Amino acid sequence: MIRRIVTDRGDSGQRLDLVFRRHLADLKGATRTQVQAWILDGAVTVNGRGVLRTAARVAAGDVLTVDLPAGVVTTRTAMPAQELALVTLYEDEHLIAINKPPGLVVHPTYRHPEGTVMNALLWQARGWRESDRPSMVNRLDKLTSGIVIGAKTARAHAAMQRALAGDRAAKEYLALVYGRVVRARGTIDLRIRRDPGDRRRVVASSGGAPSVTHWERLGRGRAEAAGLTLLKCRLVTGRTHQIRVHLAASGWPLVGDAKYGQPLWRDIADADLRESLRAFPRQALHAWRLAVTHPMTGATLRIEAPPPADLHRLLTAAGLVQCAR
């Protein structure tokens, strides 16, 4: 049996064996060692060409195939369809947009085999055409909230990935950061790459991939919340952890970012707000708005995801909620 995978931007720059391991999480026995064996045995292609290097790097939009042995196919566990309370922001015969809450994983992994956005998409797909095959077009970090796009067909998936590439789509995020940002707007042009010492982190590096983020100041915290700024960030490139790393490198770490931030809540004057900031359990980052040419119809598609309750409460306490409208 041939399994076909279209990589997304979250896979860009990753090792081939690790990408297969993530996308084959629904297969029993598809360990990293087993995946590497399939690659070395010539069972894998990338964009139609055989690849024998387990450490080969993939790019977003690559088409991967693996010829699975019969023994693996017979032990396959189907990805379960699960009814989850998700808000649909947009839907047509080709695409669906969902407002992902914080704490929810987009696609099943070894650690999160169920309870993901993809499981919920399969549940909704029960009412679609029999020929439709749901898939996720983009991803967000587990603790980042906001817009994620699903496709109903392989053709729509590939077309939407192309539409979202580069600066052809306006992808805007809300980011609550520590620091009083003085300028009204600016651009962060900083190369980033995986940290060689910790592959779960991304660092600024002259040898990294080009990464560009435009930002605009939406508002600064009231007097008691001095030291907080709400930014709108627009991605030109879409690297893993790009906004988080770019803002931290600029001296404006995201509130709640345990990986790249600092405990700057101590500098906030208001005691109640200070405690709310200390206890905020995630990075204060939200995929807010998307404007893109619909790849199947040619119409302009505009989608907006209201901030979730936890971020709304924090913005209200800081006197910034009106800036996120």
Where are these regions (language model features)?
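Structural motif
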Residues: 62-63, 239, 299
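Short Gly/Pro-enriched turn/cap motifs at secondary-structure boundaries
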Residues: 138-139, 203-207, 279-282
